[in-house]
């Protein structure tokens, strides 16, 4: 978006020739590339390439003796003003009219802009929202399911699907019962219903869960899909290395698989350990456990529980991942705020030009 093609370059060259040393110019750019160009946390190649387009236009102006007073852009959905005591140029991002708020807490407090002659420091003089407010807003992602109900429904469907796949696969696996001395004849839910919620039993269900995957290649492949998908989701960020992105994506995917497994354990405890009990009506009526597991009552309850738990727990985990990965690794800068759909902190600029002065006002719309 910030690249200058040949036709545009010729256009700007034509009008730049009309400038004199008394002229002052407001240079508008589709993207505030000075933020990326001056961020010392990025590598030098990224910084150099980011600034090429706007730097070319700036030189067209300065080579005529004119001065770029303001560089103005939108794109990033917040307000940020950079200024340097050694330069007369103000660099302003005014994207407060965007669809959703973008946080300001990752903006560098100082930009170091390199050109052929020198390195110029630009200090961050004003942002909206303030950085402290921006950091606090991230925590609203703990209510991810509330802010993104459609996506939370998608997560719930995945959780229900995998709970069904794993339980069904265990019925066709010969090694599903690590705890049954008489032979491996029980399903995951039957085994897990007998286990209390303790750390040692969690290790046990991990081994049993792996035994299902190890003997069901299709189930293993399906289980790996969310992990692979979330690795690709993580690699869409720009502020971390590919290896770091891969690790975070894999951890996120494994977190959802582990959570879905724990939810299946909880469902097993409820539906078998508590509802199907030696003194429960189902058992006293002579209904075998396998028949109860395949009854419409249990299947309906199983589907509802998987969907219900997946909606809230899956959304909570996804939101927590966005918060932690952004706070620790500076990842998902866009996603952590786009997930909030925050309509506040809108702003627009009012520019007043007189014979000898340029005034720029940042006006909040709310």
PLM feature spans:
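Metal-dependent phosphoesterase/phosphodiesterase active-site architecture
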Residues: 1-25, 32-70, 76-366
